From Swiss-Prot:
One Pfam family named in its UniProt record: TMEM125
Annotated source species: Bos taurus (Bovine)
Cellular localization per UniProt: Membrane
Top-level taxonomy: Eukaryota, Metazoa, Chordata, Craniata, Vertebrata
Descriptive protein name: Transmembrane protein 125
Main location group: membrane
C-alpha cells in the first residue's frame, strides 16, 4: 500500500511536464475553437471560390468590367484563406516551430485565423458597398439589378463575418484562463516529486533492514 501511495503522486506530477515538452500536442489544444475556425475557413473558400467562378463565367460584353473585377477579387480571397490553412498544416507536419506563442498564432483558431477573417470581412464589405454605390448611379449600359444584388450580398456577408469575429473575440477573451496559473502547479508537482523520492528512499532502507534480519535469522 505504501508503494502505491508513493507511485500515485509521481503519476499525477509527470503528465503536465511531459505534455509541456510535446510540441505536437500544442497544435491540438482547444479543439472546439479549432473546429469552428476550420469550418469558417472551409465556408470562406467554398463561398468565395464559387462566387468568383460564377461571376467570371457569366462575364459578358455589357457587364464584363465589374464581374471580372469582383470575380477575380473573390477568387484571390479564397486562395488566400486556402494558402493560410495549407501553411498551418505544413508547419505542423514539419514540426519546425518550437515557441508556444508561434504555435498559438498559426494553429487553427489562433491569431492568424482571426486576421484572415478580418481581412475577408473588410474586403467583402468594401466590395459590396462599392458595387451598391455604383448601381445607385443610373447608366443605360449598366445592369443595375445584378450589380445591386451582388453588392448587397457581398456587403451582408462581410458584415456578418465582422460581427461574428467580434463576438468570437469577446467570447474568447471572457473564457480565456490566465497564463500564470500554471506556475504554482509546477512547483507543487516538483515538491510532490521530492517527497515521493524521500519516501521511496525510506522504503528501500526498510526493505534492506528486513532482508538483513531474515538472513541473520537463517544463519
Amino acid at each position: 500500500m505504501s508503494e502505491g501511495e508513493a507511485q500515485a503522486p509521481r503519476g499525477r506530477g509527470l503528465p503536465p511536464d511531459v505534455l509541456a515538452e510535446q510540441v505536437e500536442l500544442w497544435w491540438s489544444q482547444q479543439p472546439r475553437r479549432s473546429a469552428l475556425c476550420f469550418a469558417v475557413a472551409v465556408g470562406l473558400v467554398a463561398g468565395c471560390g464559387a462566387g468568383g467562378v460564377a461571376l467570371l463565367s457569366s462575364t459578358s460584353s455589357r457587364s464584363g468590367e465589374w464581374r471580372l473585377a469582383v470575380g477575380t477579387a473573390l477568387c484571390l480571397l479564397a486562395l488566400l484563406v486556402l494558402v493560410k490553412q495549407l501553411m498551418s498544416s505544413a508547419v505542423q507536419d514539419m514540426n519546425c516551430i518550437r515557441q508556444p506563442h508561434h504555435v498559438a498564432l498559426l494553429r487553427s483558431g489562433g491569431g492568424a485565423d482571426a486576421l484572415v477573417v478580418l481581412l475577408s470581412g473588410l474586403v467583402l464589405l468594401v466590395t459590396g458597398l462599392t458595387l451598391a454605390g455604383l448601381a445607385a448611379a443610373p447608366a443605360p449600359a449598366r445592369p443595375l439589378a445584378a450589380m445591386l444584388s451582388v453588392g448587397i450580398t457581398l456587403a451582408a456577408s462581410g458584415a456578418l463575418l465582422l460581427l461574428g469575429l467580434l463576438l468570437y473575440q469577446v467570447a474568447v477573451s471572457g473564457h480565456c484562463p490566465p497564463a500564470r496559473t500554471a506556475a504554482p502547479t509546477t512547483r507543487s508537482d516538483r515538491s510532490g516529486n521530492g517527497s515521493v523520492f524521500s519516501i521511496s528512499g525510506q522504503l528501500s532502507a526498510g526493505q534492506r533492514h528486513e532482508t538483513t534480519s531474515s538472513i541473520a535469522s537463517l544463519i
